[in-house]
């Protein structure tokens, strides 16, 4: 079977790490007999420079014709003074999410063996490790609710946002969380503020209704303020965390930083058909672009998420993840994962990609 992938490398380190993800995918194709065709499109700052807008029509049409989008990163100082809606991040990513109704965001975060020193957690806590999947509703809630705006003048001026969720929006994201938990440790922690917010009362009610269809999965509820604390005390006790848009925005970044490096974290944004946009959780890192030192693992793991969720190639996705684990366990690390006195051992972006691709070929 042939798959069509829209490749949007973007700005900063995007093209460098995307090249390594493509290298690893080539190894996957050879090992598993897959036929994946890639078409590159401009997005973000480079699209502004070449086409006058961050999301050209040709890019959007190319994404519409694809089975999935493999996204790099966008943005940088060069475009920061543009009007907000014309900047790379807001002018490209948000329209893509809206156009394809990418309502589900998956953010896995794992503390790998041997990298406990990277975590800001106390050593006795980090020694236990953790493996958490944050499932975030991405297109509803307070970020998109109407009315929204400002009114009045002087001391009477006020600003307002509306938090709004429908039963359908809650149910569909909850089902994804429970399905994900079935393939993991069979536990869902639903994050809300049901002691204060009407939206959260409905959220909790609908999640409990969905849970009836998943009797093999444990469900617990936790308030958002308590969740932020418990992630610092006992992250190893969480499996899948189900969150609304606002709460997921907060918690996914907290979970990410508990690993100690954004360079290891991937992200998937998907719609109800399984079509998705897969990207690193970090940014374009313009300060290190072109130096050959960027960590490509987040981009490579994004490719694994793409294989798993949009292309339904679980075996191939797992092969990439095992290869990444082998690299990390072998001490094959880029500079940001090493202490200052060990940075002379740092591997380059290309060396990391080579090692992981070779590990995939070897069938680790």
Swiss-Prot record:
InterPro entries: IsoCit/isopropylmalate_DH_CS (IPR019818), IsoPropMal-DH-like_dom (IPR024084), Isopropylmalate_DH (IPR004429). SMART domains: Iso_dh. Mg(2+) binds at residues 225, 249, 253. It is an enzyme of class 1 (oxidoreductase). The record marks 143, 193 as: Important for catalysis. NCBIfam families: leuB (TIGR00169). Catalyzes the oxidation of 3-carboxy-2-hydroxy-4-methylpentanoate (3-isopropylmalate) to 3-carboxy-4-methyl-2-oxopentanoate. The product decarboxylates to 4-methyl-2 oxopentanoate. This is 3-isopropylmalate dehydrogenase. The gene is leuB.
